[in-house]
Amino acid sequence: MKYIDEYRDGSLAKDVARQITALADPARSYHFMEFCGGHTHAISRYGLEDLLPANVRMIHGPGCPVCVLPIGRIDAAIALAMRPEITLCTYGDLMRVPGSNGSSLLKAKAAGADIRMVYSTLDALRIADAEPDREVVFFAIGFETTTPTTALALKAAIARGLGNFSIFCNHVLTPAPIQNILESPDVRKLGTIKIDGFIGPAHVSTVIGTEPYEFFAEEFRKPVVVAGFEPLDVIQAILMLVRQVNDGRHEVENQYIRAVTALGNEKAQAEVANFFELRESFEWRGLGEVPYGALRLRPQYAAYDAEKRFSMVTPAAKDNPACECGAILRGVKKPADCKLFGTVCTPDTPMGSCMVSPEGACAAHWAYGRFREKVRQVDARRAVA
């Protein structure tokens, strides 16, 4: 298949890996963060870390919108859904994200709440149109990739006069948390590790372009390479980052030239700007409060803002203290470092959002990485023996 098969050529990937090994300075280490959950899954699925030299390490970042959603927002959605007049529409990967005290949207649905899984914003609009007596709330979540579809849904609701449709907005932004990881004293207090460069997200960058990364590449002197999701995309991006570090450069480079431009999708950006504005601050799981890290509806659309329309309150809630999801999202730990992983925390019984979402680092390690981890442990024991 064009643009897929040729980017999964194992022999080419091994050739690029050999170039990385040849270029990587053995006297130093390289730590690169892949921000996006799609890259995390590609690295785990195709075993890319096994191709890299020991001094080139990948760090999982907070690029999973479901994973970074704080427990309080889940609790607020559950409380709203339990109201008899409410129909809450949500994507499937939010259904099992744990709230406080073992709650979840799935359990609330079993308890009688009208919660419906949808595949797009259009599904929620159709429900609002077909059931005018119900207050239909769409649980909007995602990075810049999915925000335009929410904007278009709101535009359609206004045009069709759907007064029973509203949005619980949890759209988050990409550049802000990267900057937060690099400069926030709160995040440093929680713990982070040295990062030499970033693999920039693919789908997000098709919307926002590469220009938004220029500021922190220059300000924090960290190279960024925007890359696609196929294994050759990712390993080529790692090669480009190694070259930049060796050269002392800190530029934004675009590996994903077949889909990403400098300016991105300006029409989509305009639709988003029409309906949304920046929040001064928004809590991210694992990072704390991130300034300008999320969006909300503009005041003129307050009638469609579920938080204002239904006087929603986001309660203060703490993560399971045994769950390392927050540390994993900051790049401090890997899934195998969590004592819950693979024991009480599995895809069937998730203790944290990193195991629930298909983009989560724990879900990726469960699906692809845990077996290689066991092989490494066996090899290490044999080497000692």
Curated annotation (Swiss-Prot):
Q: List the GO molecular function terms.
A: 4 iron, 4 sulfur cluster binding; carbon monoxide binding; iron ion binding
* Disulfide cysteine pairs (residue numbers): none
Keyword 4Fe-4S among record annotations: yes
NCBIfam families named in the record = hypD
Q: Which cofactor does it need?
A: [4Fe-4S] cluster
Claim: Metal-binding is one of the keywords in the record: yes
Q: What positions does the entry give for Fe cation binding? A: 36, 64, 67
Summarize the protein's role.
Involved in the maturation of [NiFe] hydrogenases. Involved in the biosynthesis of the Fe(CN)(2)CO cofactor.
What species does this protein belong to? Rhizobium leguminosarum bv. viciae
Tell me the keywords, alphabetical order: 4Fe-4S, Iron, Iron-sulfur, Metal-binding
Family affiliation? Belongs to the HypD family.
This protein is called Hydrogenase maturation factor HypD
Quote the Pfam families the UniProt record gives.
HypD
Pathway info:
Protein modification; [NiFe] hydrogenase maturation
Which GO biological-process labels does this protein carry? protein maturation
